[in-house]
């Protein structure tokens, strides 16, 4: 079995049962992987030099096809209300069939780290069938120095074979597409899908399982750090502005999606970014635009002009979930260490399409835990198929429900403790609607959001007066220099005050109904942080 590239010769593919392979290419960089991807017809190079691939049927993750091994260890440690199980025997059969399927293949292997902090990173080996998948995961995770590769011993192994087809009856899964994770053996098997994001999020799920035992809170968030070393964490679901608001030219970007919070500070899990690029423009997001238009970037499902190979980022005919993967070093003000000290501020972003949340509110640690466990935003027509004219609430616990292997209260309690220990200021920011709900109101002006966020991060919001919100109980500033006072109080932006009250009460009820599943896992202080309609202030 020919093996080419820098590697640990004593810990090769045979250690994982991979045998009779055509070849294994180890730790190849972008130029070599481009060559193989083009030679194999997996991808094409566009006019900017980016490697471009289509993912076929699967243009996003398939959460219903993700399974976790339920054994004596994970029976008690995994949150089974949010995760699907298979037996150890079913996983063993799946693993054996993966190994059989791989015989005769050429595989690409990457030795990488999940995590920028040497104290907590997890050495990860990824075998892929596709060369462009190898470049993708090399871009997204942390790359070791070449000198480390000869002695690299993985703790976590991923085998990614898009041409594999699972047998639902034999393997205990739903379809021919599968993502299976064995936390005890530390193996991830991915088959049936060409969507590269399955690798990224499966590894993230695994880090979310292991790291709490080491005192690290894993988070689905972006993060940046100011010139004084003051770092900020941004939580938020898709469409809330997490990537946009954390990309601040005055601050250094730590990462755009996955981080850990330890006693030493915060650190990026990744070494690259995986940005949505539908309607990407130089004017709106110049750094992401530039990073996506150069050699080394990997574009998924982006439509191109057939003759010129120029990308059309406005064309969503293949999918609205077009993606660009690129190394962090493609962003001019990104941190190459991926690490920062203890956060000074924590921001939870919500695109409230009901138009009743204030543009900014200060949270107590208990309120922060409540809103973290709630993970609220709202969907509107145009963001997802099948939505009508009315906004639809979305609650994704810990702002990352699909990636949580442990009970959400594990992460919520860790967050609350870290906030209290490090005296972190917590903020809820509404990037959604004002002056009415979606359809009658308008989107919160980005200039207002940036100004309020700037005032929170530089400490000037500490100097203003606050009121207690009648519906949600958090503290809302009554005046902020440079901001018109009425926009700080949502009811004052609505023409119909009675309709505002009706809508606000309805949203309070949605929060309360969603949180019933967590009430047995939190203490009285967190339960008391729940929204309720309070008497109006005099």
UniProtKB/Swiss-Prot annotation:
Job description of the protein: Involved in the gluconeogenesis. Catalyzes the conversion of oxaloacetate (OAA) to phosphoenolpyruvate (PEP) through direct phosphoryl transfer between the nucleoside triphosphate and OAA.
Source organism of this protein record: Nitrobacter hamburgensis (strain DSM 10229 / NCIMB 13809 / X14)
Localization annotation: Cytoplasm
Membership in a protein family: Belongs to the phosphoenolpyruvate carboxykinase (ATP) family.
Location (main, coarse): cytoplasm
Record key words, sorted: ATP-binding, Cytoplasm, Decarboxylase, Gluconeogenesis, Lyase, Manganese, Metal-binding, Nucleotide-binding
GO biological process, one term: gluconeogenesis
The protein's name in its UniProt record: Phosphoenolpyruvate carboxykinase (ATP)
Pfam families hit by this protein: PEPCK_ATP
Keyword Transport attached: no
PROSITE patterns the UniProt entry points to: PEPCK_ATP
Binding-site residues for Mn(2+), renumbered to this chain: 201, 220, 257
Amino-acid positions noted as binding substrate in the UniProt annotation, renumbered to this chain: 61, 195, 201, 323
A GO cellular-component term linked to this record: cytosol
Pathway: Carbohydrate biosynthesis; gluconeogenesis
GO molecular function, one term: phosphoenolpyruvate carboxykinase (ATP) activity
Cofactor note: Binds 1 Mn(2+) ion per subunit.
EC nos: 4.1.1.49
